[in-house]
């Protein structure tokens, strides 16, 4: 007899589960971007997205969803570290940062 934990629950197929996962990923990336702009400089967010895309998609040949997943992990870590150090952004705002001169990179999903 096979292990019952290995069966797919009734009414669920692999396609529905995968589709739901992609929807969750897209929704979560947009949500974290909307929250991140309250705490991190936009240019930093854009640079993380651009570098994630360049490295994971262009250099490593990974899928768009994989790039979004890796970007999500980086942004979660950045927000965690920011809040751990004592977030005062909503009350005081951001001080001027030493960001690179020139035009900003294209916006990540949900911030266009």
Curated annotation (Swiss-Prot):
<keyword id="KW-0945">Host-virus interaction</keyword>
<keyword id="KW-1090">Inhibition of host innate immune response by virus</keyword>
<protein>
    <recommendedName>
        <fullName>Protein Vpx</fullName>
    </recommendedName>
</protein>
<keyword id="KW-0899">Viral immunoevasion</keyword>
<dbReference type="InterPro" id="IPR000012">
    <property type="entry name" value="RetroV_VpR/X"/>
</dbReference>
<dbReference type="GO" id="GO:0019058">
    <property type="term" value="P:viral life cycle"/>
</dbReference>
<keyword id="KW-0946">Virion</keyword>
<feature type="short sequence motif" description="Nuclear localization signal">
    <location>
        <begin position="65"/>
        <end position="72"/>
    </location>
</feature>
<keyword id="KW-1048">Host nucleus</keyword>
<dbReference type="Pfam" id="PF00522">
    <property type="entry name" value="VPR"/>
</dbReference>
<dbReference type="GO" id="GO:0044423">
    <property type="term" value="C:virion component"/>
</dbReference>
<comment type="similarity">
    <text>Belongs to the lentivirus VPX protein family.</text>
</comment>
<dbReference type="GO" id="GO:0052170">
    <property type="term" value="P:symbiont-mediated suppression of host innate immune response"/>
</dbReference>
<comment type="function">
    <text>Plays a role in nuclear translocation of the viral pre-integration complex (PIC), thus is required for the virus to infect non-dividing cells. Targets specific host proteins for degradation by the 26S proteasome. Acts by associating with the cellular CUL4A-DDB1 E3 ligase complex through direct interaction with host VPRPB/DCAF-1. This change in the E3 ligase substrate specificity results in the degradation of host SAMHD1. In turn, SAMHD1 depletion allows viral replication in host myeloid cells by preventing SAMHD1-mediated hydrolysis of intracellular dNTPs necessary for reverse transcription.</text>
</comment>
<dbReference type="InterPro" id="IPR053711">
    <property type="entry name" value="Lentiviral_Vpx_assoc_factor"/>
</dbReference>
<dbReference type="GO" id="GO:0042025">
    <property type="term" value="C:host cell nucleus"/>
</dbReference>
<comment type="subunit">
    <text>Interacts with the P6 region of unprocessed GAG. Interacts with host VPRBP/DCAF1, leading to change substrate specificity of the CUL4A-DDB1 E3 ligase complex.</text>
</comment>
């Amino acid at each position: 007899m096979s292990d019952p934990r290995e069966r797919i629950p009734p009414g669920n197929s692999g396609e529905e589960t995968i589709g739901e996962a992609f929807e969750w990923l897209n929704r979560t990336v947009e949500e974290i971007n909307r929250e991140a702009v309250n705490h991190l400089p936009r240019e930093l967010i854009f640079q993380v997205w651009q570098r994630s895309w360049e490295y994971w998609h262009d250099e490593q040949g990974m899928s768009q969803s994989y790039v979004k997943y890796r970007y999500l992990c980086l942004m979660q870590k950045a927000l965690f570290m920011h809040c751990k150090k004592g977030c005062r952004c909503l009350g005081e705002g951001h001080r001027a940062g030493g960001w690179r001169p020139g035009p900003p990179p294209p916006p990540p999903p949900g911030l266009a």
